[in-house]
Amino acid sequence: MEKQDYTKSIKRSAATGLWGSAAAVILTALFHFVSPWRFYPSQHTSRWMLIAGAVLAVLALSMSLLVIRKQIPALRQSEGLETKLSGYAQHIRSLYLTMLAVVVLICVFTVLSAQNVLLMLAMVATLMLILAYPNIYRIKVELGLTDEEMKSLYGDQYIADGDNAEK
């Protein structure tokens, strides 16, 4: 796979996960607060959905943050730009698409159980995706790339620190 394909894969996976999660949360909030249709589960069912959704959200968030903490230093230590990019693309794809699935599942639990707490947990998961979004400079720092490697990847889109000092 070519280097540009890895960067496109990183952007596409992150955008799909982030915008899908944001759309799911917004649609759930609209359905939950604006829609005239309601589900009325029993109190027992509602409580179990709240517990299951909360446990799922907390486990998914903690595992995602743990994976970010453990994987990024390992990727930085690896040799070769191709290896770093392929590992990072796989890491971003699994992180964002897994969190998209978790957010959608939490939103389904929110609609079926009518629990506002689950909607807030879905918003926290989406906020985590926003904060972990891989832009050009974040990729440089997380993978430990040099300015030459970044210019070979992004061309004119990348502005090195030395370029700003000259102007």
Task: Name each region found by the language model.
Residues M1-T7:
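Short, Lys/Arg-rich, polar N-terminal cytosolic tail immediately upstream
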Residues T45-L61:
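Alpha-helical transmembrane segments
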Residues M99-L121:
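Alpha-helical transmembrane segments and their membrane-interface junctions
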Residues G87-L95, K151-K167:
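Cytosolic juxtamembrane regulatory segments of multi-pass membrane proteins
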Residues V34-H44:
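Membrane-interface helix termini and inter-helical loops of multi-pass transporters
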